[in-house]
Regions:
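Divalent-cation
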Residues: 1-83
């Protein structure tokens, strides 16, 4: 059985790119998803992004090679918020 991964991102207005605000695997990933649901934070499932971002340091800016895929994720979130 595959272990779930979750990565929470924060994108401050003046930042060059989003930052990793939380990372979890297994039960920790489930907790991140639970907190997101409790606070009506949109969740986007993207296994490739989760694999790459889940090994980054919490508080670090996302790697430049992930900017395009993360931009696509944020695009989905913005569309969701406009609904």
């Amino acid at each position: 059985m595959k272990e779930w991964k979750a990565v929470a991102l924060k994108y401050p207005e003046n930042a060059e790119a989003p930052f990793i605000s939380a990372v979890g695997k297994g039960l920790a990933a489930e907790k991140i998803l639970e907190i997101a649901k409790e606070h009506s934070i949109p969740v986007v499932e993207n296994e490739i992004a989760a694999d790459v971002l889940s090994v980054q340091e919490i508080g670090s800016m996302i790697p430049e090679n992930t900017w395009e895929i993360v931009a696509q994720i944020f695009s989905v979130v913005v569309k969701y918020e406009k609904m």
